[in-house]
Amino acid sequence: MTKANTDAGTDVGTDAAPWTVQDDLLARIADRAPGYDAANAFCAEDLDELRAAGYLRIGVPVAQGGSGLGLHATAAVQRTLAQAAPATALGLGMHQVWVQAARAVRARGESFLQAVTDRAADDQLLAFGVSEPGNDAVLFDSSTTAEPDGDGGYRFTGTKVFTSLAPAWDVLSVFGKDETGPEPRLVHGFVLRSDGDVEHLDDWDTLGMRATQSRTTKLHGVHVPADRIVRSLPVGPNQDPLVFGVFAAFELLIASVYVGVAERAIALAVDAVGRRVAADGSPRSDDPDVRRALADLRGAVDAITLQVDALARSVDERDELGARWFPLLVGTKARAVDTAQHVVDEAMRVVGGSAFRSSSELARLARDVRAGQYHPSSRDSAARTLATSVLGPPA
């Protein structure tokens, strides 16, 4: 595993302090990963050590005590962390999505997510309460009820799913639909753990990515006062800075985790074939079929890494991609996940039967990588977006 290079991707036009996950910390995180997986436990010690190392502040401006990293550099950190512990990278990455969303909003002249940056600067852990059962519209509609309190605040009632960091968050984003006015509005706000009326079910027992503890969440009329309501948007797709900031950071930081998983699978395969010797005494690494397979895997990961890096840099540099933004973001995420799953599966085939042991790291990666298909945007959703971008909407 190598440290992330964070010399690029810092806040444009501002000072930045390069930040890396130190090798000794990476090693401890990697050592704990099998135990968290086996026990289906939250990565609490990883969070404690990363918080102490400044990880929760890497995207916070230097003036507020952070490192000022942009999306490109944060993606590199996530890729490195995922090589040590995919579930830790995925779960804690939800915090980084909010930090980078706030950065994108700020870079585009808005300040409504300043409280997100302020809380991250105080080392508070941010989580997402967005996904809902059966809601394929994700940010563009909600089955959660947002009831106005008459003073600018709201009470939220509904069910959220895949709430990563459930045991540990300090601040949870919520959104729901207010249907009391002439037109329905989607209301976004933030809940503090001390607010109460938020219930997490102990129902996270999954094939992989177990240390995220992404539990089902019940909102029992939780009250969010006016000063923690950040946006009210129309139902349906829109280009609001909140939507863009969250969408860009989510898709690319998710993609980065799965690129890191693929990188680790290649490293494990290379190590395994380097130690194996055929019956005739020749090293397995000299087998032309093995060499061709690993060459193909290396090329596939190089290609998707370049795509993620280029698009993250475009976000940092505020490139004007217009209507191309969303097709590029969903396509890159979908390709990253598909590539990672292919790479892990092929790495297992190249390594052979030892990879099939439940104790093998590759076997754990094979389970973890399959979570990628369940994060928005799915392959089918991405395909619909891409088709619409070239053919227009269906009749």
Predicted regions and their residues:
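C-terminal helix-coil-helix/basic helical segment that borders enzyme active sites and/or dimer interfaces
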Residues: 30, 34-37, 302-335, 348-356
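Glycine-rich phosphate/pyrophosphate-binding beta-alpha loops
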Residues: 161-166, 250-253, 372-375
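Glycine-rich beta->alpha junctions and the first turn(s) of the following alpha-helix
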Residues: 206-301
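Asp/Glu-rich intrinsically disordered low-complexity tracts
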Residues: 3, 7-11, 15
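Glycine-rich flavin
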Residues: 44-51, 58-159, 164
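Generic structural signal for well-ordered, non-transmembrane alpha-helical segments
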Residues: 260, 295-302, 330, 334-341, ...
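A short core secondary-structure module
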Residues: 159-200
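Glycine-rich phosphate/cofactor-binding loops in nucleotide/flavin-utilizing enzymes
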Residues: 353-395
